[in-house]
Structure formats: C-alpha cells, structure tokens
C-alpha cells in the first residue's frame, strides 16, 4: 500500500483507504475517492496529481494525494489477468 502521491504517471491503482480529517475525507468521498475505486494517474510531476476517476479528470494537491492509500494494479500480459500488488 502506497500513498497516491508516490504513484507514477500511467499507473492504474485501487483505493484502499483515505487517512484524513472527517470533513476532508467526506469531501474526497463526494468526489469519488472511496475504497475499491480504480484510478489512473495521468500526471504526477511535482505540484498537483492529475487522475482519472470514473471517466472524469481530477486534480488534487500532492498533500491530499499523500492521504489516499492505494495498491498498484499490474497487467500480466502473458496470463491475460490483472494483479493487485501490496507493497
């Protein structure tokens, strides 16, 4: 499990949990950042983290992204399946 702020551009992840104050967590949940949702990281180059969530592109600060914990989804081309990896 890693914070979203450390995930590379192009990676697909599954949200595991959000560690934040209640009001901030509620706001993130309202945006769609809930456990078991998948996210694709579009950009993560210092400033904001740009993600695609449910077909919508969203930008969040690195500080907020550090509070969203995820597992990376790896595609295994040889076996035509996806694997979630806990780190």
Explain the meaning of each model-derived region.
Residues 23-27, 44:
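Short alpha-helix capping/helix-loop boundary micro-motifs
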Residues 2-6:
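Ubiquitin-like/PB1-type beta-grasp interaction modules and other compact soluble beta-rich domains
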